[in-house]
């Protein structure tokens, strides 16, 4: 047998989500009692094992806020200027900040018309009134109603309650409730305004009990960068990004690895590198905190067809996870997940968390454009290797950044629409519910036990058909089993 024929002889068999099921085990575990929290880097623990993809139709600041509030993590895409991405990170960090530091204020000598202008411009309901850096009053929209032309000092509330900067959340809430006020100025020892506490922020903090926050009480957020854009990584790190995600189609590129090593030395944030599908890549990426697995499994990705390269996702996860375990690296499975059951399978195969694109692209918080087709609402969804995304700036992800000036792009993705699915909260509720159900069947109390106890059975195409609803016309669509994908 010749050397080329031997390639086929030693070829491994690859499996993806539809090729396997998990075998049910004897269990005392109830789905309601399982712990789905997971560690994805040394310093970042999520309360649900889900990240939103760094795609320009999936994750911007609104998605990142929603993900963090539900216990996951949003990765803000890089198909924008550095300044725009930095601002997006800052918006997430400010979304539930206990003490707002960049306070919009007004002078008592200004008109109420200008006060109203400031409130509408910044989407707020009230302003501290400041003179010589000291708080002399508070003015709100209800104070201004039908009072055009008057000065702020004539209508402001003058008896202002202030608090010191070391105040605790519960104490601030108690003061606001007892005094029936919505805003609490924070002052230093000299009485100068240094921040503001609002009732809306405190209510939000109490509402989202599963939220993931940093040591300052701010929501966690990640941001994507090119392996060659060190300046972007540094700026995002300074802006407060908790995780830098190096976002490239093929992270086992030696030039990229050299650049990533340099980048790693210049940022303090935790460091995730992707994407890979070969365990040998892990040997060269040990400087990372986690690796992201997936070459071509996504619904909008054509890499496997255009380039002929990839590894079926379950096999890729398992091979990479085995190697990553040797180095103490975390594993994120990126792409190919269609149902909640696929999340269970991905974790049982060795992943610590999954990254979702398609399943979140149809949500209210996703930045994709809404369209109506035959009376039904859809949202735009495209691969970062699609022609539109590459034209906007995503070509570098596929090592085609220099092509525009000399030739046409060679896309590795498509553009389309996905059905509107409601809010992120609604979608994640179903996905996490399915994960918990799967853990109950396997007898896993937590993510670690799911990885240890999960045992696979390989199924045939007949087994797959049997797994889906059959021999029935479905009249009522289930929220976790859409008829239209």
From Swiss-Prot:
UniProt binding sites for IMP: 299, 334-336, 357-358, 381-385, 412
Name of the protein in question: Inosine-5'-monophosphate dehydrogenase
Chain positions recorded as K(+) binding sites: 296, 298, 301, 466-468
Catalytic activity: IMP + NAD(+) + H2O = XMP + NADH + H(+)
SMART domains recorded: CBS, IMPDH
Family of the protein in this entry: Belongs to the IMPDH/GMPR family.
Subunit structure: Homotetramer.
Domain CBS: 99-154, 156-215
């Amino acid at each position: 047998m010749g050397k080329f024929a031997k390639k086929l002889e030693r070829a491994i068999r690859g499996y993806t989500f539809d090729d396997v099921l998990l075998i049910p085990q004897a269990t005392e575990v109830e789905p309601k009692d399982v712990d789905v929290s997971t560690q994805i880097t040394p310093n970042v623990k999520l309360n649900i094992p889900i990240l939103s993809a760094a795609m320009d139709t999936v994750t911007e600041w609104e998605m990142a806020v929603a993900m963090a509030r539900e216990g996951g993590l949003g990765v803000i895409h890089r198909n924008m200027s550095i300044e725009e991405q930095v601002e997006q990170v800052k918006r997430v960090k400010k979304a539930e900040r206990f003490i707002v530091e960049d306070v919009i204020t007004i002078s008592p000598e200004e008109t109420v018309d200008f006060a109203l202008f400031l409130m509408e411009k910044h989407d707020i309901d009230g302003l501290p009134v400041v003179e010589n850096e000291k708080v002399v009053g508070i003015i709100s929209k209800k104070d201004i109603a039908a009072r055009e032309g008057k000065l702020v000092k004539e209508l402001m509330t003058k008896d202002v309650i202030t608090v010191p900067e070391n105040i605790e959340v519960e104490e601030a809430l108690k003061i606001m409730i007892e005094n029936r006020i919505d805003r609490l100025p924070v002052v230093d020892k000299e009485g100068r305004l240094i921040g503001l506490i609002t009732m809306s922020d405190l209510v939000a903090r109490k509402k989202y009990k599963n939220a993931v926050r940093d040591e300052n009480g701010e929501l966690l957020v990640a941001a994507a960068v090119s392996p060659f854009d060190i300046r972007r990584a540094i700026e995002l790190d300074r802006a407060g990004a908790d995780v830098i995600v190096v976002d490239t189609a093929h992270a086992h590129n030696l030039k990229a690895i050299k650049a990533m090593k340099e980048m790693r030395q210049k940022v303090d944030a935790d460091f995730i590198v992707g994407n890979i599908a070969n365990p040998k890549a892990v040997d060269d990426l040990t400087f990372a905190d986690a690796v992201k697995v997936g070459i071509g499994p996504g619904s909008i990705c054509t890499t496997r067809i255009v380039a002929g390269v990839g590894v079926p996702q379950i096999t890729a996860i398992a091979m990479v996870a085995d190697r990553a375990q040797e180095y103490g690296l975390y594993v994120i499975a990126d792409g190919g997940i269609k149902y909640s059951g696929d999340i269970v399978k991905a974790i049982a195969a060795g992943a610590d968390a999954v990254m979702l694109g398609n399943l979140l692209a149809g949500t209210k918080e996703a930045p994709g454009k809404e369209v109506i087709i035959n009376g039904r609402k859809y949202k735009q969804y495209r691969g970062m290797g699609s022609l539109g995304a590459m034209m906007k700036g995503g070509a570098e992800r596929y090592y085609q950044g220099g092509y525009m000036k000399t030739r046409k792009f060679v896309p590795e993705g498509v553009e389309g629409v996905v059905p509107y699915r409601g809010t992120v909260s609604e979608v994640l509720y179903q996905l996490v519910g399915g994960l918990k159900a799967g853990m109950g069947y396997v007898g896993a109390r937590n993510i670690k036990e799911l990885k240890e106890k999960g045992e696979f059975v390989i199924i045939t195409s007949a087994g797959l058909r049997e797994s889906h609803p059959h021999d029935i016309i479905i009249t009522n669509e289930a929220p976790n089993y859409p008829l239209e994908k």
